[in-house]
Amino acid sequence: MSTLAITWYGHATFVVTTPGGKRIVFDPWLTGNPKAPAGAKIDKADVICVSHGHSDHTGDVVNVARATGAPVVAIFELASWFESKGLKDTVGMNMGGTTEVKGLRISMTPAVHSSSVVEDGHTQYLGEPAGFVVRLEDGRKIYFAGDTALFGDMRLIRELYAPEIAFLPIGDHYTMGPEAAALAVDMLGVRQVVPMHYGTFPALTGTPDALKRLVEPMGVDVLVMNPGETAQ
């Protein structure tokens, strides 16, 4: 099987390098991210997928897009907001839709969360939160859930897309915790789960160890990474 490389920058920021050498960036937030390695930067990207508008998921989208020239894929309202910040290459889409970027098929899935930005003391709605299923060149599919609670239609994500790897939030408080994430793993039918969105802030108390205790008896691999680490 061709190599897939995953680099984690802490929180929910990942660079996934596909078997064909494409770099998919998810939710880039480096500046002010207490878990990001010192001096971390993302200077190569083929596509940037942004799940929702909260600053801990959008903080470096504009910087990375300008540095790399990569298009930004997001729900329509969020893509329009990025355009208002000067980005020219955006792909606005919506739930259930699929687009193709540089040979990668990207489908937008629902998430149960919220999405907004605070500017000049005012909160601006930025469309619904989302997740993504990306079909790689070798046919494998990965599911990046974004920030979400557990929801029953994860079963439909399994039925429609059959992802092999899921990136799931486990920190609790703002998203699901390990117990709900374990049920998500079962509903999705994935072979491997990459925990994210934990330990960044005191409120995010869910841990990878708690998730491992719940899903390893299912035969599911839990990929626990250190910020800045790349796993294949």
Annotate each language-model stretch with its function.
Residues 25-28, 45-53, 73-76, 142-148, ...:
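Active-site neighborhood of phospho(di)ester-bond hydrolases with catalytic His/Asp-centered motifs
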Residues 118-187:
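Active-site-proximal loop/helix segments of hydrolase catalytic cores
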